[in-house]
Design a protein with these regions (language model features):
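Domain-level signature for proteins that mediate thiol-based redox and metal-cofactor handling
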Residues: 1-195
Length: 195
């Protein structure tokens, strides 16, 4: 990903302005502020998630806002869930990566809560190539029929594509993943839990 595309930044228009903000319409601008913000977005697009190093924080959808301040930049992040053990490492990675932009302030915004729907299409494909089955869509706010026996969504194997898979454990190497096995190719894999 070279620069953030408008699809990554469309939600910015709904946020309250705090300072100079990069928006989808600013990406082509050449003034110093927008150029700095575009450069900062470019840097952030290469900061990898410490628990899933196949995707960047931008692709994961946890970078919510980027604002130019008087002496640097402010980055607003939404953690994947409250209590995520990688939060401090993520904050430090962001500070280190953006240090050339001056003072880096990292703010955690927990509302609205992060959802796997915020993972970009490119991020989902990178998860798949890394061997992690990406999450399906979350239909927040839509009613779900109550069933006595819960039917599981068919999870496609990231290696062979078969949906003939079985869950081995609700818990994988991190709290946001579960462990599966493909019955077709017999390979184990992790599935990023939809939130």
């Amino acid at each position: 990903m070279n620069t953030p595309t408008p699809s990554h930044l469309d939600w910015l228009s709904s946020l309250t302005p705090v300072g100079t903000r990069a928006s989808s319409s600013d990406l082509g601008a050449t003034d110093l502020g927008c150029g700095r913000l575009s450069a900062a977005w470019e840097v952030l697009s290469h900061v990898l998630d410490p628990e899933v190093p196949a995707v960047s924080l931008v692709e994961l959808g946890i970078v919510r806002d980027l604002v130019e301040t008087a002496d640097g930049v402010e980055v607003v992040l939404t953690p994947t869930y409250s209590g995520c053990p990688a939060t401090e490492a993520i904050e430090q990675s962001v500070r280190d990566a953006l240090s050339r932009f001056g003072t880096v302030t990292v703010t955690m915004r927990r509302a609205p809560a992060w959802t796997t729907d915020w993972i970009t299409d490119e991020g989902r494909e990178k998860l798949r190539r890394y061997g992690i089955a990406p999450p399906g869509p979350v239909d927040a706010g839509q009613g779900v029929p109550i069933r006595i026996v819960r039917r599981r969504e068919a999870i496609a194997c990231p290696r062979c594509g078969s949906t003939h898979t079985e869950q081995l454990s609700a818990f994988g190497s991190t709290a946001c993943k579960s462990l599966y096995r493909c019955v077709a190719c017999r390979e184990p894999f992790e599935h990023f839990k939809p939130i």
